Amino acid sequence: MLTRFARYLVPSVLVVGLMSLGAPCAAQEVGAPDAPDAHEGRGSVVAPSPWLTVSTPIRRGVDFKLSTFYIGEFQVPVVQIDVPVRATKFLTITPSYLYNWVPASGLNKMTPQPLGATDSYEENQFRIDGTVTFPIQKFEISARNMYVRRFREGAANDIGRYRGRIGIAHPLAVGGRTWKPFASYESFYERKGGWNRDRVWSGVTIPVTKQLMFQPSYMWERSHGNRDVNYVLLGLIVNTK
């Protein structure tokens, strides 16, 4: 059944992309089939999404990060592996791999009108990105450019995607600890679909202990052919350094 909609496949998977704004900040993605343009139908959806990232150093300037999260409304598990490499003081290069699986029930919730899908959908992604981070007074500015190769099942063709994101963060002293509020905007481009997705994301990174941080955040996503999604994200970041 899913192959009927394969030519409309455009991602809508909560992708855990780790972004360096002084402290780790996790963002996301959910890949799902899109129906043809529908201007009427079901409205936006709220998706509570817990996640966990564990980071450990491999050697000086190179880390290994394992992230997992669950998009409750769509019943989607996601796993991502990142290997950030600190190339210069301001530039980090990160190769990464992401896997997600969407059940048929999740596919039917993502679009303005139910797809009638009876099969699940899975996708593998290999990505490479470069993130430039620099300070302006106490603000931390970041700009990330990412290339994603999407390997999709069934009749859907493998395709490439560009993702561009700009972000800002600012440390804030609270009760003897340094909290870090942040905000970012990201856009997505694919050769056939053009600029087909936007994300606005905001939250705060809160240190709990030296090796543990808590990050509540909110992300709004608009994508071509899918319902708008309001992600309510609750994450834990564990650093073994």
Give, region by region, the residue ranges found by the protein language model.
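N-terminal secretory signal peptides that target proteins for export/translocation
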Residues: M1-R7
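Bacterial N-terminal signal peptides
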Residues: V10-L21
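Short glycine/proline- and aromatic-enriched beta-strand/turn motifs that initiate or cap beta-hairpins
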Residues: C25-D82, K241
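Solvent-exposed loop/turn segments connecting transmembrane beta-strands
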Residues: E40-P48, S67-V78, E122, F151-G160, ...
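Residues on the lipid-exposed face of transmembrane beta-strands in outer-membrane beta-barrel proteins
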Residues: L52-T56, I81-V85, I128-F134, Y147, ...
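Detector for outer-membrane/organellar transmembrane beta-barrel domains
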Residues: P57-G61, S142-S184, V238
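Repeated loop/turn-to-beta-strand initiation elements of outer-membrane beta-barrel proteins
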Residues: I58-L66, K89-P95, Q137-I141, V174-W179, ...
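Outer-membrane beta-barrel translocator/channel fold
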Residues: Q75-V76, T92-N157, S184, Q215-N239
